[in-house]
């Protein structure tokens, strides 16, 4: 794997819009190099026959089943409104003509 230079770290910091102090460049260069070496090791792992996944632990949906539920009678609901007009709620006007 290629060596990471200080200029590479500066470029990544600039692309990420990070204000990276000059005295930290050497530290981050070494850390980034270590990360890339680890990624190189991961690329060598034999994953033949391993199913693809998006997470380490399988997640299942725990919500209730969607089904038809009884509802209140329309007239009972409309009767609770401060104002109504036929089968609709009447609300104050909020937009000008």
Swiss-Prot record:
UniProt keyword Transport present: no
GO molecular function, one term: ATP binding
Catalysed conversion reaction: L-glutamyl-tRNA(Gln) + L-glutamine + ATP + H2O = L-glutaminyl-tRNA(Gln) + L-glutamate + ADP + phosphate + H(+); L-aspartyl-tRNA(Asn) + L-glutamine + ATP + H2O = L-asparaginyl-tRNA(Asn) + L-glutamate + ADP + phosphate + 2 H(+)
Biological processes per GO annotation: glutaminyl-tRNAGln biosynthesis via transamidation; regulation of translational fidelity; translation
SUPFAM superfamilies: Glu-tRNAGln amidotransferase C subunit
Keywords noted in UniProt: ATP-binding, Ligase, Nucleotide-binding, Protein biosynthesis
Keyword Protein biosynthesis appears in the UniProt entry: yes
Matches recorded under NCBIfam families: gatC (TIGR00135)
Subunit record text: Heterotrimer of A, B and C subunits.
HAMAP family from the UniProt entry: GatC
Official protein name in the record: Aspartyl/glutamyl-tRNA(Asn/Gln) amidotransferase subunit C
Underlying gene: gatC
């Amino acid at each position: 794997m290629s060596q990471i230079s200080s200029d590479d770290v500066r470029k990544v910091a600039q692309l990420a819009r990070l204000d990276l102090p000059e005295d930290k460049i050497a530290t981050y260069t070494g850390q980034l190099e270590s990360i890339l070496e680890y990624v190189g090791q991961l690329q060598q792992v034999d994953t033949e026959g391993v199913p693809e996944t998006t997470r380490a632990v399988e997640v299942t949906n725990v919500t209730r089943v969607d089904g038809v539920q009884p509802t209140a009678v329309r007239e009972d609901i409309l009767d609770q409104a401060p104002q109504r007009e036929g089968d609709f709620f009447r609300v104050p006007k909020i937009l000008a003509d």
